[in-house]
Swiss-Prot record:
A Pfam short name: TPP_enzyme_C
Residues annotated as transmembrane: none
4Fe-4S ferredoxin-type domain span: 680-709, 736-767
Cofactor(s) the protein requires to work: [4Fe-4S] cluster; thiamine diphosphate; Mg(2+)
Organism: Desulfocurvibacter africanus
InterPro entries xref list: 4Fe4S_Fe-S-bd (IPR017896), 4Fe4S_Fe_S_CS (IPR017900), PFOR_II (IPR033412), Pyruv_OxRed_insertion (IPR055168), Pyruvate:ferred/Flavod_OxRd (IPR050722), Pyrv-flavodox_OxR_EKR_sf (IPR037112), Pyrv-flavodox_OxRtase_EKR (IPR019456), Pyrv/ketoisovalerate_OxRed_cat (IPR019752)
The gene coding this protein: por
Protein name as it appears in the record: Pyruvate:ferredoxin oxidoreductase
Length: 1232
């Protein structure tokens, strides 16, 4: 066998094996495992063959629970089957995992070990998820590196086939799954040679088949269940030997030796760490560094975690060990110790011999950095205080568990390793370009290469830091670069925010992308700290105006290839001419599908970069550059002590005491960021403005503030604070201004695009030309009182004079979701509950520390919460039940008070509140009166009522989520909640893909669209969720598209919120995953075209109209204008199929057009047919409810819980279970 080297990441290395060894894969996206499924789906679309000569059969399911069920079924029917998951996804699979292991089926689950959402969600790596599944009966095999992920994946598949025991192969999320390394991969023929064909044949022979049938999954009684559970023992006893055997067989092919437990370190070690996962790489690097100094230390790497084989553990442990520290990357509150520690302790206790001192340590939760200095601290603790149940990597100033860490500990990377940092802006291409650079270096030199990428939680436009290493020796540094030879800053705003040169080596290279072309410019703009570091460390300092080059060649903000060219020119890893040639080849490979124009723009950028790099010779005076005195903006203590350190990349240094134990964060912290990362921002041209407020309405980041001011409020305004006479009779006496928030603007340009006048009132200009003038103007405008009462709140213009209670989110520039949500908060924000499904809207909506939801000037605002991906509807339903129960109790108290304590004004206010408690305006009106009248009241019924003042105003419960939630994983709960009849509002932001996990197909994805998990174009149609829900008949349903009709959107919101029952509003939302060819600055235009073309028809279904004898269905959009082909081809998700599968593309587009035509005709028919006209229900009311007469035995919605009858409070299931005669004797029925 010849060696085949590949520069790849852990996910791809694993998928390479899983694809080869599997016949079926059932998948569902979850970060950070998704790319395994994406790669497998892409290979299958290309017709790649596995070791059986087949193309993998791969299907996306509606959830991880569904994927696990499909895996179970496929295994039961005799196909070797795999899946890929992590975190909450793995938890959803646990019930099926018990079934799969109980039936001895040889499936393999590949898991990118990730944190579990507890006090907060974390998409990053630790071992909480895999430990939560350790009791399922799956064998568990751990990998520590990218190479091991490949090798152990193969061992897992081979051992599963022979042992009949399913395997969970896991490796650290992000740290291994997304780390790029140069590794050796095996050919499929070599893998096939290792398969036990006899065991495979036996598996197939035992599978379910009507040709030789048997029964599985029986129900067993107490007489036999126990025995059946123990019958599998012999299979598990054989697993360790089988795994060890296949480790040896893989070693015979690769030369890489593995054991169930591997030991590295001094043969006579006295201090030994036991750990598993990527931490082992860092620990081994430290051991190699300290071994030369005679340190008697070692490490046991756990590979086979389940079954845990004590004999193999003791065979690996040096007899000289006096102190052992077991490191766990999890937290199990209330347990005497974490899982691996308890396993090790149990092994020693069962052995019954003298025990060394055994310590427990916790590290690395949520991908918390685990550095060589921390490893040194763990070893020092074993020879010093021997602190037990410690934490390392944090400062625990609450319970005192943390170990001290000396961050000045030595650089332990192998000598000659070159280390680089690239500070980029999300979506500027930096990360993608660095992945290419690593692959170019790895594939075209003898050097070892490593790449790792850290991000904040912004959807795009956030900070990205790429950490690259390369050298002549293998790289085991599974931690961030902290001593860099080369630092590149790709956004000039960063030099004033972050300490980007922290840790750079003396004589290192610093490359800046900025428009500052002269030393005078640099002296003016560079902070003193940066200048001092440059001069004192004698750095080589270069600048390149990458944005200008990108703009000139037509790339916009995509500066990646320009900065990569600079890197190859300065780093000296490859001869520069060769590097440029390889870079251009990579451009053709990466962008060839997007057309020659895109390729040429990128190659032109490379050519221009070669001649545009400018070296600066700086003066010695920079060594002592005086520190600036910055005026701190008015902020609160939480911002200064918590938010600011996190924003400046210093969050690792915050102690435990800085945080609330339950994970809560205050609202409105995003307003303090002021990142200033846009390239261009809008400039207001007053003389062209028609004062329509549409620009503010569509702004994705709430960066446009329409201002109404009285003359006296403009006294003392900045000189260029231009204000016009406000138009409209209601606004007589007011001045009007559009104020741009330049530092929070993301520069998408939607505002300028939709500005109605021919001569635009908003013109995009470079940020540097606007900042100095508009920052003072914004500060002044923000102090002018909001004029929220002058125009109707639910009008287009009036809505934008309401204070937005969601602003400056972490969404992508031009996001199609955020404008909708901001407007909803402007209409109802001060009384909203928001139950948000996990997804884009939860990540841009609540990623610590920047909270875009905010309070108004009275301290009121959306109460926002996130539970899980799958249960947002139920979560919001629970909020509604809580409000119902608590306000019902309040109403009971008010009624009792009227009978006893209340008199005069209090009595009148209570009567008014009781009559209008379910009306938001009246409940607030009388509630405000009660607050004044009962102020200071402490005792009696009135005291109780006063204590419940936060319940006076009727609350508005909203459930937010994307199409992945509503159409797929959360559909069951959504359907139940809508069917309940309860008063909740559901708002679905339909981007037609799983946006948050990177653009995978959902059931909202239309026919012919290319998405991840649908690489060959989706072959089935879009789920018609709106019409499905309409079949209930008592749910308000509407579709909206802001870019087509803002008025219709506002009308829908008003109707949906006022409807006394469930409402569902589905909004068409643009997304970067759709690949808008004109860019996200055309989001509103695309929304408009979507409706005009017939792709996204607008309609409303209001059950209240049926009660009045009217047609509840109203079609709000016109007939398609014939532009659907143009609409589809303006998006890469449709256009890209032309290049890969042209015949399929043509057929599928025709199919889409036919589906849209049929649907619109059906909608027209519904709008033209009123079946309610001739038999409106007797007693129909305007609100849609029906009076069925006194004493009628019906479940009702008004003033009663869902499952109680109005007269008796007895359980009521709306007769879903049938009559008592139909049900029979319930006592004899089998329960679940």
């Amino acid at each position: 066998m010849g060696k085949k080297m590949m520069t790849t990441d852990g996910n791809t290395a694993t998928a390479h094996v899983a694809y080869a060894m599997s016949e079926v894969a059932a998948i569902y996206p979850i970060t950070p495992s998704s790319t395994m499924g994406e790669e497998a789906d892409d290979w299958a679309a290309q017709g790649r063959k596995n070791i059986f000569g087949q193309t993998l059969t791969i299907r996306e399911m509606q959830s991880e629970a569904g994927a696990a069920g499909a895996v179970h079924g496929a295994l039961a029917a005799g196909a070797l089957t795999t899946t890929f998951t992590a975190s909450q996804g793995l938890l959803l699979m646990i019930p099926n995992m018990y079934k799969i292991s109980g039936e001895l089926l040889p499936g393999v689950f590949h898991v990118t070990a990730r944190a579990i959402a507890a006090h907060a969600l974390s998409i990053f790596g630790d071992h909480q998820d895999i430990y939560a599944a350790r009791q399922t009966g799956f064998a568990m095999l751990a990998s520590s590196s990218v190479q091991e992920a490949h090798d152990m994946a193969l061992v897992a598949h081979l051992a599963a086939i022979e042992s009949n025991v399913p395997f969970m192969h896991f490796f650290d999320g992000f740290r291994t799954s997304h780390e790029i390394q140069k590794i050796e991969v095996l050919d499929y023929a070599d893998m096939a040679s290792l398969v036990n064909q006899k065991a495979l044949a036996e598996f197939r022979a035992k599978s379910m088949n009507p040709e030789h049938p048997h029964v599985r999954g029986t129900a067993q009684n107490p007489d036999i269940y126990f025995q059946g559970r123990e019958a599998a023992n012999p299979y598990y006893l054989k697993v360790p030997g089988i795994v060890a055997e296949y480790m040896q067989k893989v070693a015979s092919l690769t030369g890489r030796s593995y054991k169930l437990f591997d030991y590295v370190g001094a043969p006579d070690a006295e201090r030994v760490i036991v750990s598993m996962g990527s931490s082992c790489e860092t620990i081994e690097e430290v051991i190699n560094h300290l071994a030369a100094k005679g340190e008697k230390i070692g490490l046991i790497k756990v590979r086979l975690y389940r079954p845990f084989v004590s004999e193999a553990f003791f065979a690996a442990l040096p007899a000289s060990a006096k102190v052992i520290t077991v490191l766990d990357r999890t937290k199990e509150p209330g347990a005497p110790g974490d899982p691996l520690y308890l396993d090790v302790c149990s092994a020693f206790v069962e052995r019954g011999e003298a025990m060394p001192k055994i310590l427990a340590g916790r590290y690395g939760l949520g991908s918390k950095e685990f550095s060589p200095a921390m490893v040194k601290s763990v070893y020092d603790n074993m020879s010093g205080a021997k602190k037990n149940h410690f934490t390392v990597g944090i400062e625990d100033d609450v319970t005192g568990t943390s170990l001290p860490v000396d961050n000045a500990f030595a650089d332990t990377t192998p000598k000659g390793t070159i280390q680089c940092q690239f500070w980029g802006l999300g979506a500027d291409g930096t990360v993608g370009a660095n992945k290419q650079a690593i692959k170019i270096i790895g594939d075209n030199t003898d050097l070892f290469a490593q790449g790792y990428f850290s991000y904040d939680s912004k959807k795009s436009g956030g900070i990205t830091i790429s950490h690259l290493r390369f050298g002549e020796k293998p790289i085991q540094s599974t931690y961030l670069v902290n001593r860099a030879d080369y630092v590149a800053c790709h956004n000039p705003a960063y030099v004033g925010i972050y300490d980007i040169l922290e840790g750079i080596k003396d004589g290192g290279t610093f490359v800046l992308n900025s428009p500052w072309s002269s030393l005078e410019d640099m002296d003016k703009h560079l902070p003193s700290g940066i200048k001092r570091t440059i001069a004192n460390k004698k750095l080589k300092f270069y600048n390149i105006d990458a944005v200008k080059i990108a703009t000139d060649v037509g790339l916009g903000g995509r500066i990646n290839m320009i900065m990569q060219t600079a890197f190859f020119k300065l780093a000296g890893v490859l001869p520069f001419e060769k590097a440029v040639d390889l870079l251009k080849k990579s451009i053709h490979k990466a962008y060839g599908k997007k057309g020659e124009k895109i390729v040429k723009m990128n190659t032109d950028a490379v050519d221009q970069a070669v001649t545009s790099l400018q070296e600066f010779k700086y003066p010695d005076s920079w060594k002592d550059a005086p520190a600036e005195t910055k005026a701190e903006p008015m902020t609160n203590e939480f911002f200064k002590n918590v938010v600011k350190p996190i924003l400046t990349q210093q969050g690792d240094k915050l102690p435990v005491s800085a945080f609330e134990a339950d994970g809560r964060f205050p609202l409105g912290t995003s307003q303090f960021e002021k990142r200033g990362v846009a390239i261009n921002v809008p400039q207001w041209v007053p003389e062209n403005c028609i004062q329509c407020n549409q620009c503010a309405f569509v702004c994705p980041h709430s960066a446009i503030l329409p201002v109404l001011a009285k003359e006296e409020e403009l006294v003392g305004a900045p000189a260029n604070f231009t204000a016009l006479e406000a138009k409209g009779k209601e606004l007589k006496g007011y001045k009007f201004r559009i104020q741009i928030n330049t530092l929070d603007c993301m520069g998408c340009g939607n505002c300028a695009d939709i500005c109605p006048p021919k001569e635009k009132a908003l013109v995009m200009q470079p940020l540097d030309t606007q900042r100095d003038a508009q920052v003072p103007n914004l500060e002044y405008a923000a102090r002018i009182p909001v004029k929220s009462e002058v125009l109707p709140r639910d009008s287009l213009k009036g809505s934008q004079f309401q204070e937005p209670l969601m602003e400056f989110s972490g969404a992508c520039s031009g996001c199609g979701e955020t404008p909708y949500v901001r407007v909803i908060t402007q209409l109802f924000g001060e009384r909203m509950f928001i139950a948000n499904a996990t997804g884009c809207s939860s990540i841009w909506g609540a990623s610590a520390p920047s909270m875009p939801y905010k309070t108004n000037r009275l301290g009121q605002g959306p109460a926002w919460g996130n539970s899980l991906f799958e249960d947002a509807a139920e979560y919001g339903f629970g909020m509604n039940m809580s409000m119902f129960a608590r306000r019902t109790h309040l109403a009971d108290l008010a009624a009792k008070a009227l009978e006893s304590d209340a008199s005069g004004d209090v009595k009148e206010a209570l009567q008014g509140w009781l009559a209008g408690k379910n009306d938001p305006i009246k409940s607030k009106e009388y509630g405000d009166k009660l607050k004044k009248l009962l102020a200071g009241q402490k005792d009696g019924l009135l005291g109780q009522i006063a204590a419940m003042s936060d319940l006076y105003t009727k609350k508005s419960v909203w459930i937010f989520g994307g199409d992945g939630w509503a159409y797929d994983i959360g559909y069951g709960g959504l359907d139940h909640v809508l069917a309940s009849g309860e008063d909740v509002n559901v708002f679905v932001m339909d981007t037609e893909v799983y946006s948050n996990t990177g653009g995978q197909s959902s059931k909202a994805t239309p026919t012919g669209a290319v998405a991840k998990f649908a690489a060959a174009g989706k072959r089935t149609g879009k789920k018609d969720l709106a019409r499905m829900v309409m079949t209930y008949g008592y749910v308000y349903v509407a579709t909206v598209s802001m870019g087509y009709s803002k008025q219709q959107f506002l009308k829908v919101l008003k109707e949906a919120e006022s409807f006394p029952g469930p409402s569902l509003v589905i909004a068409y939302a643009t997304c970067i995953n759709q690949g808008l060819r004109k860019g996200m600055g055309k989001s509103q235009d695309v929304m408009n075209t979507a409706v005009k073309s017939g792709y996204w028809p607008l309609f409303r279904y209001d059950p209240r109209l049926a009660a009045q004898g009217k047609n509840p269905f109203q079609l709000d959009s016109k007939a398609p204008d014939g532009s659907v082909e143009e609409f589809l081809m303006a998006q890469n998700r449709f256009a890209v199929l032309d290049r890969s599968f042209p015949e399929d593309a043509k057929r599928l587009r025709a199919q889409v057009a036919h589906e849209l035509d049929v649907r619109f005709k059906e909608l027209e028919h519904m709008a033209a047919t009123n079946i309610f006209e001739s038999f409106a229900p007797a007693g129909g009311k305007a609100d849609g409810s029906v009076d069925f007469g006194e004493g009628a035995e019906f479940c009702t919605r008004d003033d009663t819980p869902m499952m109680a009858r109005p007269d008796s409070g007895e359980a009521c299931d709306q007769n879903r279970a049938g009559t008592s005669e139909q049900q029979g004797d319930l006592s004899k029925r089998t329960k679940k």
